[in-house]
């Protein structure tokens, strides 16, 4: 059985105004990942995501590239204990 866990990621580069959060939500829903994504005042996007470990790995790989018009310079990740979220929200 695949382990469930959460992760918090900070993504910097050209990641605001390029549909990064909406695209992340679409993929998260396809992968059955819950959590949220929000813009930060410093220009980064913060993502908190919970799901099965293999699905989170796939999601993290995507976060390192982002949608077509994005340019990801840095994507940091911190693994966290499981939290039971139901949906993936854009904040």
Swiss-Prot record:
Enzyme class at the top of the EC tree: hydrolase
Record-linked SUPFAM superfamilies: Acylphosphatase/BLUF domain-like
Span of domain Acylphosphatase-like: 6-91
InterPro entries with a match to the protein in the record: Acylphosphatase (IPR020456), Acylphosphatase-like_dom (IPR001792), Acylphosphatase-like_dom_sf (IPR036046), Acylphosphatase_CS (IPR017968)
Pfam families: Acylphosphatase (PF00708)
Cystine pairings recorded for this chain: none
Any GO molecular function: acylphosphatase activity
Keywords, ordered alphabetically: Hydrolase
Keyword Metal-binding assigned: no
Reactions mediated catalytically: an acyl phosphate + H2O = a carboxylate + phosphate + H(+)
Domain of life assignment: Bacteria
Location of the active site: 21, 39
The EC number(s) this enzyme carries: 3.6.1.7
Family note: Belongs to the acylphosphatase family.
NCBIfam families reported for this sequence: PRK14451.1
Name of the protein this chain belongs to: Acylphosphatase
């Amino acid at each position: 059985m695949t382990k469930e866990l959460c992760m918090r990621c900070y993504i910097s580069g050209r990641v605001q105004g390029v549909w990064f959060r909406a695209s992340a939500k679409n993929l998260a829903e396809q992968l059955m990942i819950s959590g949220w994504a929000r813009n930060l005042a410093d220009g980064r996007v913060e993502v908190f995501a919970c799901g099965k470990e293999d699905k989170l790995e796939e999601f993290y790989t995507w976060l390192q590239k982002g949608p077509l018009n994005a340019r990801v310079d840095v994507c940091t990740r911190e693994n966290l204990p499981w939290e039971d979220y139901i949906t993936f929200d854009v904040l």
